Amino acid sequence: IQLENASVVILNYTLQFVPIKHRETLLRRIRSAMQPGDVLILSEKLTLPDPQLNDYLIELHHNFKRQQGYSDLEIAQKRQALEDVLIPETRHQHVERLHQVGFSRCDIWFQCLNFASLIAIA
């Protein structure tokens, strides 16, 4: 991607579909198009370091989908379709990578279950 003078960049549930080996390069390109004080908003599905807690949050999300009228079959089919395509990472992995590519400060500013938005300041 080509970016110039990007004061705000928003990546909503995008990075999780980029192969892990290319994520740093993409974020480095974004950062290089930003000036100090510019902002990146990064929203992603997270995986938690505690497997039991991670599974619990996934089940809560599935319960939410059921309440919205999705069948168990639809939920299972979507999960299988995303199985090897959506590769989530931990909060720590995201924060470390953002620092590595040159963002000075970053942290989660919003989270619901295992979906989070991070803010990173160039």
Which residue ranges define each predicted feature?
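A short glycine-rich, Lys/Arg-flanked "PGG" loop and its adjoining helix->strand segment in the class I
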Residues: 24-36
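Conserved beta-strand signature within the Rossmann-like core of class I S-adenosyl-L-methionine
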Residues: 34-46
